[in-house]
Amino acid sequence: AYFGRAVDFMLVQDFSSALDDLNRAIMTSQNFTLAYFLRAVVRAKQIEYQLSAESVQSIDFQQVRSKNSKDFSLSGLPAVGNESLKMEYEMVLRDYEKVIESAPRFIYVYYNRGNLRCSQQDYRGAIADYTEAIRLRPDFGDAYYNRGLVYLKQGDTVKGTADLSKAGELGVVAAYNL
């Protein structure tokens, strides 16, 4: 009952209520793998929402009006070094680890953890996670796409281009727009 309601709360972006119900579901059943996965997803969404809200609040709109738009940069954005933010990321990573312990062949946990690691600029970890997702499901186009972007970010155009090409072959249309 808690899990289903948590899904409903997540769909309407009531993240705190979703987390409350997921915590209850996990307390009811410590081995509820899907609840751990969804809790990690909800926490990651909550972090994303919090960062975007803080980013918007930190923009000096007078400065934006006075500058040419191509010269504008979001220099006042919250840093990933924030201690409470680091703790939030750690909680998400712990939930993903719990899912991997109980369901090591669940590809989306590697994919999502790769996305999280990429947002933390842990590119080596992100590549490892995308690679594992691809190993488990060789036709996972989105994992090829994201891994290709990370390779490009690191300056490895050969591997990046190969992954983006493969992603395109697998139906990820965005891979052709880079």
What are these regions (language model features)?
Residues 1-178:
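Alpha-helical tetratricopeptide repeat
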